[in-house]
Design a protein with these regions (language model features):
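Elongated, amphipathic alpha-helical interaction scaffolds
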Residues: 1-310
Length: 310
Protein backbone atom coordinates (compact mmCIF):
# COMPACT_ATOMS: atom_id res chain seq x y z
CA UNK A 1 0.00 0.00 0.00
CA UNK A 2 1.35 3.43 -0.91
CA UNK A 3 1.63 6.45 1.38
CA UNK A 4 -1.35 8.06 -0.32
CA UNK A 5 -3.49 5.01 0.34
CA UNK A 6 -2.70 4.91 4.07
CA UNK A 7 -4.97 7.84 5.05
CA UNK A 8 -7.86 6.25 3.21
CA UNK A 9 -7.40 3.03 5.14
CA UNK A 10 -7.31 4.89 8.46
CA UNK A 11 -10.35 6.98 7.52
CA UNK A 12 -12.40 3.93 6.53
CA UNK A 13 -11.38 2.03 9.65
CA UNK A 14 -12.34 4.83 11.99
CA UNK A 15 -15.27 6.46 10.18
CA UNK A 16 -16.87 3.53 8.40
CA UNK A 17 -20.40 4.38 9.53
CA UNK A 18 -19.93 8.01 8.54
CA UNK A 19 -18.57 6.90 5.17
CA UNK A 20 -21.67 4.85 4.39
CA UNK A 21 -23.96 7.62 5.65
CA UNK A 22 -22.40 10.09 3.23
CA UNK A 23 -21.73 7.91 0.20
CA UNK A 24 -24.20 5.00 0.33
CA UNK A 25 -27.12 6.22 2.40
CA UNK A 26 -29.60 3.47 1.53
CA UNK A 27 -27.20 0.79 2.68
CA UNK A 28 -26.28 2.78 5.79
CA UNK A 29 -29.93 2.96 6.82
CA UNK A 30 -30.32 -0.82 6.49
CA UNK A 31 -27.49 -1.55 8.96
CA UNK A 32 -28.02 -2.15 12.68
CA UNK A 33 -25.33 0.16 14.04
CA UNK A 34 -25.91 -0.99 17.62
CA UNK A 35 -23.75 -3.96 16.61
CA UNK A 36 -20.18 -2.82 15.81
CA UNK A 37 -18.97 -3.73 12.29
CA UNK A 38 -16.22 -6.33 12.00
CA UNK A 39 -13.24 -5.55 9.78
CA UNK A 40 -12.27 -8.66 7.82
CA UNK A 41 -9.21 -7.42 5.96
CA UNK A 42 -7.25 -10.60 6.72
CA UNK A 43 -9.94 -12.68 5.04
CA UNK A 44 -9.74 -10.39 2.02
CA UNK A 45 -5.95 -10.70 1.83
CA UNK A 46 -6.24 -14.47 1.61
CA UNK A 47 -8.17 -14.33 -1.65
CA UNK A 48 -6.73 -11.17 -3.27
CA UNK A 49 -5.34 -11.77 -6.79
CA UNK A 50 -1.54 -11.73 -6.81
CA UNK A 51 -1.42 -9.30 -9.73
CA UNK A 52 -3.20 -6.69 -7.57
CA UNK A 53 -0.05 -6.18 -5.49
CA UNK A 54 1.23 -2.61 -5.93
CA UNK A 55 -2.01 -1.20 -7.31
CA UNK A 56 -3.13 2.11 -5.86
CA UNK A 57 -6.26 0.71 -4.32
CA UNK A 58 -7.66 0.31 -0.83
CA UNK A 59 -9.77 -2.78 -0.32
CA UNK A 60 -11.94 -3.36 2.74
CA UNK A 61 -14.12 -6.30 3.69
CA UNK A 62 -16.56 -5.51 6.48
CA UNK A 63 -19.24 -7.59 8.18
CA UNK A 64 -22.33 -5.70 9.34
CA UNK A 65 -25.59 -6.75 10.97
CA UNK A 66 -28.78 -5.65 9.25
CA UNK A 67 -31.92 -4.27 10.86
CA UNK A 68 -33.76 -7.12 9.15
CA UNK A 69 -31.86 -9.52 11.38
CA UNK A 70 -29.35 -10.99 8.94
CA UNK A 71 -25.69 -10.23 8.35
CA UNK A 72 -24.03 -8.92 5.23
CA UNK A 73 -20.46 -8.72 4.04
CA UNK A 74 -19.52 -5.49 2.32
CA UNK A 75 -16.63 -5.41 -0.12
CA UNK A 76 -15.39 -1.84 -0.49
CA UNK A 77 -12.95 -1.33 -3.32
CA UNK A 78 -11.53 2.17 -3.24
CA UNK A 79 -9.73 3.32 -6.38
CA UNK A 80 -7.39 6.25 -5.68
CA UNK A 81 -5.12 6.12 -8.69
CA UNK A 82 -5.01 9.25 -10.84
CA UNK A 83 -5.73 7.45 -14.10
CA UNK A 84 -8.66 5.16 -14.92
CA UNK A 85 -7.92 1.44 -14.83
CA UNK A 86 -9.30 -0.46 -17.79
CA UNK A 87 -9.62 -3.70 -15.81
CA UNK A 88 -11.32 -2.12 -12.81
CA UNK A 89 -14.79 -3.62 -13.33
CA UNK A 90 -13.27 -7.03 -13.97
CA UNK A 91 -11.24 -6.72 -10.76
CA UNK A 92 -14.44 -5.94 -8.85
CA UNK A 93 -16.01 -9.09 -10.28
CA UNK A 94 -12.95 -11.22 -9.49
CA UNK A 95 -13.00 -10.13 -5.85
CA UNK A 96 -16.74 -10.75 -5.68
CA UNK A 97 -16.68 -14.30 -6.99
CA UNK A 98 -13.59 -15.23 -4.95
CA UNK A 99 -15.29 -14.14 -1.73
CA UNK A 100 -18.50 -15.94 -2.67
CA UNK A 101 -16.57 -19.07 -3.66
CA UNK A 102 -14.52 -19.22 -0.44
CA UNK A 103 -17.01 -17.99 2.16
CA UNK A 104 -20.48 -18.31 0.54
CA UNK A 105 -21.82 -15.21 2.32
CA UNK A 106 -24.25 -12.48 1.21
CA UNK A 107 -22.05 -9.80 -0.32
CA UNK A 108 -22.38 -6.23 -1.57
CA UNK A 109 -19.53 -4.74 -3.62
CA UNK A 110 -19.06 -0.96 -3.46
CA UNK A 111 -16.63 1.16 -5.47
CA UNK A 112 -15.28 4.62 -4.65
CA UNK A 113 -13.61 6.33 -7.62
CA UNK A 114 -11.04 8.96 -6.74
CA UNK A 115 -9.66 9.72 -10.20
CA UNK A 116 -10.02 12.96 -12.18
CA UNK A 117 -11.59 11.59 -15.37
CA UNK A 118 -15.16 12.89 -15.41
CA UNK A 119 -16.43 10.28 -17.86
CA UNK A 120 -14.79 7.22 -16.30
CA UNK A 121 -17.59 5.60 -14.27
CA UNK A 122 -17.32 1.81 -14.30
CA UNK A 123 -20.26 0.12 -12.57
CA UNK A 124 -20.71 -3.12 -14.48
CA UNK A 125 -18.78 -6.14 -15.76
CA UNK A 126 -20.34 -8.03 -18.65
CA UNK A 127 -19.31 -11.10 -20.62
CA UNK A 128 -21.35 -13.18 -23.07
CA UNK A 129 -20.51 -16.14 -25.24
CA UNK A 130 -22.93 -18.48 -27.01
CA UNK A 131 -25.78 -17.97 -24.59
CA UNK A 132 -23.63 -17.89 -21.45
CA UNK A 133 -23.77 -14.44 -19.91
CA UNK A 134 -22.38 -12.60 -16.89
CA UNK A 135 -23.83 -9.22 -15.91
CA UNK A 136 -22.29 -8.00 -12.66
CA UNK A 137 -23.39 -4.51 -11.53
CA UNK A 138 -22.07 -2.69 -8.47
CA UNK A 139 -22.85 0.68 -6.81
CA UNK A 140 -20.22 3.39 -7.20
CA UNK A 141 -19.56 6.87 -5.93
CA UNK A 142 -17.42 9.34 -7.86
CA UNK A 143 -15.57 11.71 -5.53
CA UNK A 144 -15.19 14.23 -8.35
CA UNK A 145 -18.96 14.79 -8.23
CA UNK A 146 -18.59 16.34 -4.78
CA UNK A 147 -16.81 19.35 -6.29
CA UNK A 148 -20.26 20.86 -6.82
CA UNK A 149 -21.04 20.36 -3.11
CA UNK A 150 -18.03 22.00 -1.46
CA UNK A 151 -20.14 24.34 0.67
CA UNK A 152 -22.39 21.51 1.84
CA UNK A 153 -19.38 19.36 2.71
CA UNK A 154 -17.78 22.17 4.70
CA UNK A 155 -20.97 22.64 6.71
CA UNK A 156 -21.52 18.93 7.26
CA UNK A 157 -21.13 17.42 10.72
CA UNK A 158 -20.13 14.13 9.11
CA UNK A 159 -16.36 13.65 9.64
CA UNK A 160 -16.03 11.80 6.35
CA UNK A 161 -17.02 14.99 4.55
CA UNK A 162 -13.66 16.37 5.70
CA UNK A 163 -11.89 13.32 4.27
CA UNK A 164 -13.53 13.83 0.87
CA UNK A 165 -12.73 17.55 0.95
CA UNK A 166 -9.09 16.77 1.74
CA UNK A 167 -8.96 14.37 -1.21
CA UNK A 168 -10.52 16.90 -3.59
CA UNK A 169 -8.45 19.87 -2.45
CA UNK A 170 -5.24 17.85 -2.58
CA UNK A 171 -5.87 17.32 -6.27
CA UNK A 172 -7.19 20.83 -6.90
CA UNK A 173 -4.08 22.41 -5.35
CA UNK A 174 -1.49 20.21 -7.08
CA UNK A 175 1.48 22.43 -7.86
CA UNK A 176 0.19 25.25 -5.62
CA UNK A 177 1.39 24.57 -2.06
CA UNK A 178 0.26 27.97 -0.73
CA UNK A 179 -3.34 27.27 -1.70
CA UNK A 180 -3.03 23.78 -0.26
CA UNK A 181 -1.78 25.21 3.02
CA UNK A 182 -4.78 27.55 3.21
CA UNK A 183 -7.19 24.73 2.48
CA UNK A 184 -5.53 22.52 5.07
CA UNK A 185 -6.01 25.21 7.71
CA UNK A 186 -9.55 25.85 6.47
CA UNK A 187 -10.43 22.20 7.01
CA UNK A 188 -8.82 22.07 10.44
CA UNK A 189 -10.48 25.09 12.04
CA UNK A 190 -14.04 23.67 12.14
CA UNK A 191 -12.81 20.59 14.00
CA UNK A 192 -12.11 22.74 17.04
CA UNK A 193 -15.20 24.91 16.65
CA UNK A 194 -17.48 21.85 16.58
CA UNK A 195 -16.11 20.51 19.82
CA UNK A 196 -14.89 17.23 18.34
CA UNK A 197 -13.16 14.82 20.67
CA UNK A 198 -9.39 14.96 20.91
CA UNK A 199 -9.16 11.47 19.42
CA UNK A 200 -11.31 12.43 16.42
CA UNK A 201 -9.32 15.61 15.81
CA UNK A 202 -6.03 13.72 15.90
CA UNK A 203 -7.34 11.02 13.60
CA UNK A 204 -8.71 13.49 11.04
CA UNK A 205 -5.54 15.54 11.29
CA UNK A 206 -3.44 12.49 10.43
CA UNK A 207 -5.59 11.90 7.36
CA UNK A 208 -5.27 15.54 6.27
CA UNK A 209 -1.56 15.59 6.99
CA UNK A 210 -0.96 12.46 4.93
CA UNK A 211 -3.04 13.65 1.98
CA UNK A 212 -2.21 17.36 1.93
CA UNK A 213 1.56 17.18 2.06
CA UNK A 214 3.41 20.51 2.08
CA UNK A 215 7.02 21.44 1.23
CA UNK A 216 9.19 22.09 4.27
CA UNK A 217 9.19 25.89 4.15
CA UNK A 218 5.41 26.14 3.86
CA UNK A 219 4.94 23.34 6.39
CA UNK A 220 6.73 25.50 8.96
CA UNK A 221 4.32 28.38 8.27
CA UNK A 222 1.46 25.91 8.58
CA UNK A 223 2.78 24.89 12.00
CA UNK A 224 2.79 28.54 13.10
CA UNK A 225 -0.86 28.98 12.13
CA UNK A 226 -1.80 25.67 13.69
CA UNK A 227 -0.28 26.72 16.99
CA UNK A 228 -2.39 29.88 16.89
CA UNK A 229 -5.54 27.84 16.29
CA UNK A 230 -4.72 25.53 19.17
CA UNK A 231 -4.03 28.42 21.52
CA UNK A 232 -7.16 30.33 20.48
CA UNK A 233 -9.29 27.29 21.24
CA UNK A 234 -7.23 26.21 24.25
CA UNK A 235 -7.29 22.72 22.78
CA UNK A 236 -3.83 21.42 21.88
CA UNK A 237 -5.29 18.28 20.30
CA UNK A 238 -2.90 17.90 17.43
CA UNK A 239 0.35 18.50 19.36
CA UNK A 240 1.91 19.53 16.08
CA UNK A 241 5.36 20.19 17.55
CA UNK A 242 5.58 16.61 18.77
CA UNK A 243 4.20 15.26 15.48
CA UNK A 244 6.85 16.97 13.36
CA UNK A 245 9.49 16.21 15.96
CA UNK A 246 8.65 12.54 15.69
CA UNK A 247 9.35 12.70 11.96
CA UNK A 248 12.55 14.68 12.35
CA UNK A 249 13.86 12.76 15.35
CA UNK A 250 12.85 9.22 14.46
CA UNK A 251 16.17 8.23 12.93
CA UNK A 252 18.09 9.64 15.87
CA UNK A 253 15.56 8.10 18.23
CA UNK A 254 16.20 4.64 16.87
CA UNK A 255 19.95 5.05 17.25
CA UNK A 256 20.22 7.20 20.37
CA UNK A 257 17.05 6.30 22.23
CA UNK A 258 13.55 7.29 21.16
CA UNK A 259 13.01 9.94 23.82
CA UNK A 260 16.26 11.74 23.05
CA UNK A 261 15.58 11.68 19.31
CA UNK A 262 12.11 13.13 19.75
CA UNK A 263 13.32 15.94 22.02
CA UNK A 264 16.07 16.83 19.54
CA UNK A 265 13.46 17.10 16.79
CA UNK A 266 11.28 19.29 19.01
CA UNK A 267 14.17 21.64 19.73
CA UNK A 268 15.05 21.94 16.05
CA UNK A 269 11.50 22.85 15.10
CA UNK A 270 11.07 25.30 17.99
CA UNK A 271 14.30 27.07 17.04
CA UNK A 272 13.04 27.48 13.47
CA UNK A 273 9.65 28.73 14.59
CA UNK A 274 11.31 31.31 16.85
CA UNK A 275 13.84 32.35 14.22
CA UNK A 276 16.80 31.30 16.35
CA UNK A 277 20.12 30.11 15.01
CA UNK A 278 19.72 26.35 14.93
CA UNK A 279 22.00 24.19 17.04
CA UNK A 280 23.55 21.41 14.99
CA UNK A 281 22.00 18.01 15.42
CA UNK A 282 25.37 16.51 16.34
CA UNK A 283 25.77 19.00 19.19
CA UNK A 284 22.24 18.36 20.46
CA UNK A 285 22.75 14.61 20.49
CA UNK A 286 25.75 15.13 22.75
CA UNK A 287 23.69 16.91 25.43
CA UNK A 288 22.35 14.85 28.39
CA UNK A 289 18.67 14.02 28.21
CA UNK A 290 17.61 16.12 31.22
CA UNK A 291 19.33 19.20 29.78
CA UNK A 292 17.70 18.63 26.40
CA UNK A 293 14.29 18.48 28.05
CA UNK A 294 15.00 21.70 29.94
CA UNK A 295 16.09 23.48 26.74
CA UNK A 296 12.95 22.23 24.95
CA UNK A 297 10.71 23.49 27.75
CA UNK A 298 12.39 26.92 27.72
CA UNK A 299 11.89 27.26 23.96
CA UNK A 300 8.27 26.15 24.25
CA UNK A 301 7.66 28.76 26.94
CA UNK A 302 9.30 31.43 24.79
CA UNK A 303 7.09 30.50 21.85
CA UNK A 304 3.93 30.65 23.97
CA UNK A 305 4.94 34.09 25.29
CA UNK A 306 5.58 35.30 21.75
CA UNK A 307 2.14 34.13 20.62
CA UNK A 308 0.40 35.86 23.53
CA UNK A 309 2.10 39.13 22.65
CA UNK A 310 1.22 38.94 18.93
Amino acid sequence: MTEYDSPWKEALDRYFQSFLALCFRELHDAVDWSVPPRMLDKELQRIAPQNDVGLRTVDKLVEVCLLSGGTEWLLIHLEVQSQPATAFAKRMFVYYYRIIDKYDRPLVSLAVLGDEEQNWRPNRFERESYGCRIDFAFPTVKLLDYLSQIEELEQSENPFATVILAHLMTRQTAGNPLDRCQWKLRLLRPMYARGMSAEDVRSLFRVLDWMMELPTDIAIEFERELLKIEQENQMPYVTSIERRAAEQGLEQGLEQGLEQGLIVGQIELLQRLLGHVETSREDLLGVPLDQLAQQRDQLQGELETTRKND
